[in-house]
């Protein structure tokens, strides 16, 4: 079965967002994005 692109995109965004929330609540100080990611033009 195939998953529509928009659903996949939404799922990935949610996973990344909840990963950031979890890290914050657990007291981890990791950066959300690397320096290379901040400098990249999307």
Swiss-Prot record:
This is Soluble lytic murein transglycosylase. SUPFAM superfamilies: Lysozyme-like (SSF53955). Keywords: Cell wall biogenesis/degradation, Lyase, Periplasm. It is found in: Periplasm. Its EC number is 4.2.2.n1. InterPro entries: Lysozyme-like_dom_sf (IPR023346). GO terms for biological process: cell wall organization. Murein-degrading enzyme. Catalyzes the cleavage of the glycosidic bonds between N-acetylmuramic acid and N-acetylglucosamine residues in peptidoglycan. May play a role in recycling of muropeptides during cell elongation and/or cell division. Its main location: periplasm. The keyword Lipid metabolism does not apply. It comes from the Bacteria. Belongs to the transglycosylase Slt family. GO terms for molecular function: lyase activity. GO terms for cellular component: periplasmic space. It catalyses: Exolytic cleavage of the (1->4)-beta-glycosidic linkage between N-acetylmuramic acid (MurNAc) and N-acetylglucosamine (GlcNAc) residues in peptidoglycan, from either the reducing or the non-reducing ends of the peptidoglycan chains, with concomitant formation of a 1,6-anhydrobond in the MurNAc residue.
